[in-house]
Regions:
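Extended hydrophobic/Leu-rich segments
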Residues: 1, 115, 278-282
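Iron-sulfur (Fe-S) cluster-binding segments and ferredoxin-like electron-carrier domains
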Residues: 240, 246-273
Length: 284
C-alpha cells in the first residue's frame, strides 16, 4: 500500500480521467455501453494495461457473456468471468432479468415511458429489470481483482453507467436504476479510495451522457459499425436481438440518432423486427 495516501481530487467529477493512473479494470456485460468503455480504456491505457470482467448472475441467457468475451479477445484484453449466482438465489422473482423469474420483460415501450407509467400509478419508478445492488457488488469485486492483477499500482474501475439509466422524476431522489446515479458513483468512489488507501478510483466516463452520446463516444474511440453490432444488449436470447424490449428500443434509437444505423436494412439485419418496425425506427 502507499506509504502516504493521496486521495482522489476529482470530487464529484468521476466522469473525468483520474490523474496518475495507468491501469484499468472494466465491467463488461457484452452490451454497447460497456463495449464503449472498453474501447475507451484500451485507447487511453493500452490493451496490456486493461482487464475486462463479466458477471454471470443467473441471467436469462449467456449470449451477452459470449459477446463480452469476444470484445475482450478482439482487443487483446484479459477476460475474467465471475459466477455470483449464489448471491441472487434467494428471490429470483425480484428482477425480470433472472432466468425463471415470474416477472416478464416489458415489450414495445422505452424506459422513459415505463417510468412515467409507474409514477402515474403512484409506484416507485424502479425498473423491473433492476438487479438488487448489482453495480455496487460488481464495482467492489472489480476493485478486489484490480488490487491483485495490478499488484497494488493505482488503477481505475470503469463502468458504463450513463444518464439515461437514472431516469428520475424531477424533484425525486428515486430513479429507474438507483445504482447508476451520480450520487451513487461519487459516494462509491470515495469509499473505494478509503478502503484501498487511494489505490482504486471509480471512473464513469459515460455518467452524464445520453444513450445517443454514448454511441457517439464509442465512434470517437474507434468503434465501427461491426463493433456495435457484435455487442448484445437484448434481454431475450435467440439468434437476433428482439428489437422490442426497452433496452433494444433505446439502443436502436441511439444508433439511428448517432448516424450508425442509416437504413432500415441496418436494423432488419441485426434485430428480429419487421420492415414496418424498422421504418418507424428510421422515422419513415
Amino acid at each position: 500500500m502507499n506509504a502516504e495516501v493521496k486521495y482522489d481530487t476529482r470530487d464529484s467529477k468521476v466522469d473525468t480521467l483520474p490523474e496518475g493512473v495507468k491501469y484499468a479494470i472494466c465491467a463488461v456485460s457484452g452490451g454497447m455501453d460497456s463495449a464503449t468503455c472498453l474501447f475507451h480504456a484500451v485507447r487511453t491505457y493500452g490493451a496490456e494495461n486493461v482487464c475486462g470482467v463479466a458477471l454471470y448472475y443467473g441471467q436469462r441467457h449467456d449470449i451477452e457473456l459470449a459477446a463480452a468475451k469476444e470484445e475482450c479477445d478482439s482487443l487483446k484484453v484479459r477476460y475474467i468471468e465471475l459466477d455470483v449466482t449464489p448471491i441472487f438465489d434467494f428471490n429470483r422473482d425480484i428482477s425480470a432479468l433472472f432466468a425463471g423469474s415470474k416477472k416478464e420483460v416489458v415489450q414495445d415501450k422505452d424506459y422513459a415511458t415505463i417510468m412515467h407509467e409507474k409514477i402515474a400509478k403512484g409506484e416507485a419508478p424502479i425498473s423491473d429489470e433492476y438487479i438488487p445492488n448489482r453495480n455496487s457488488l460488481f464495482i467492489n469485486a472489480l476493485c478486489a481483482i484490480g488490487l491483485q492483477v495490478f499488484e497494488e499500482k493505482p488503477f481505475a474501475v470503469i463502468t458504463g453507467i450513463h444518464s439515461d439509466d437514472v431516469l428520475k422524476q424531477e424533484g425525486s431522489n428515486v430513479g429507474a436504476y438507483p445504482d447508476c446515479s451520480p450520487e451513487f458513483a461519487i459516494a462509491t468512489n470515495k469509499a473505494l479510495q478509503i478502503s484501498t488507501s487511494g489505490l482504486c478510483y471509480l471512473y464513469t466516463p459515460l455518467l452524464h451522457k445520453t444513450k445517443t452520446q454514448v454511441a457517439e463516444f464509442g465512434k470517437e474511440n474507434g468503434m465501427t459499425y461491426a463493433d456495435f453490432n457484435k455487442t448484445w444488449s437484448c434481454y431475450k436470447g435467440g439468434t437476433k436481438q428482439c428489437g422490442r424490449c426497452p433496452t433494444c428500443i433505446d439502443r436502436i434509437n441511439a444508433l439511428v440518432k448517432a448516424g450508425i444505423y442509416v437504413t432500415t436494412i441496418d436494423i432488419i439485419d441485426n434485430y428480429d423486427v419487421t420492415a414496418e418496425t424498422a421504418m418507424k425506427y428510421m422515422g419513415k
